[in-house]
Swiss-Prot record:
This is DNA polymerase epsilon subunit 4. Accessory component of the DNA polymerase epsilon complex. Participates in DNA repair and in chromosomal DNA replication. Has a role in cell cycle progression. Required for wing morphogenesis. PANTHER family: DNA POLYMERASE EPSILON SUBUNIT 4, HISTONE-LIKE TRANSCRIPTION FACTOR CCAAT-RELATED. The gene is PolE4. Keywords: Nucleus. It comes from Drosophila melanogaster (Fruit fly). It is found in: Nucleus. One of its GO terms (molecular function) is protein heterodimerization activity. InterPro entries: CBFA_NFYB_domain, Histone-fold, Transcr_DNA_Rep_Reg.
Length: 155
């Protein structure tokens, strides 16, 4: 199982674009249509349900400056501040905006997931449940796209 097959099957940019477009259209539809909700209550005096219409206003989802930053922080499992600090260690990089840090964080998460899947195949072959260093080494040597990590596990 090569990592290229995993990326083609699960991580397509077209799916992301379609999902993003669907979310934007849903937000636009919700913002345009605010309908009153009917709440029916039964009273002890009247056994039949009385219909009352109440106007309930919901706060529409806005694309403010704080909302995306909060959502981005919640969507990643790695700390964005630490990734920003690691990125700043590069002398060619002067500034990194939030979007760049978020993209790098997501890319690192996908890379770690791919490496762990490849490593787990060797763990499962040896009938173990815990991924060990030798499993990661075997995955690195077996998958062509991971060969750049050869020797990185020697510490």
């Amino acid at each position: 199982m090569a990592s290229e097959e995993l990326f083609e099957a699960e991580f397509s940019e077209e799916q992301d674009l379609e999902h993003q477009q669907a979310m934007e259209t849903e937000e636009a539809e919700l913002a345009e249509t605010e309908e009153p909700l009917e709440i029916t209550e039964e009273s002890p005096d009247n056994p039949e349900a009385e219909s009352t219409t109440e106007q309930l206003t919901e706060k529409p989802v806005t694309n403010g400056n704080k909302a995306p930053a909060d959502n981005e922080a919640k969507m990643t499992q790695l700390p964005l501040a630490r990734i920003r600090n690691i990125m700043k260690l590069d002398p060619d990089l002067h500034m990194a905006n939030n979007e760049a840090v978020f993209i790098v964080a997501k890319a690192v998460e996908l890379f770690i997931a791919s490496l762990s899947r490849e490593s787990y195949t060797y763990t499962a072959q040896s009938k173990k449940k815990t991924i060990q260093k030798r499993d990661v080494d075997m995955a690195i040597s077996a998958v062509d796209s991971l060969l750049f990590l050869d020797g990185a596990m020697n510490f």
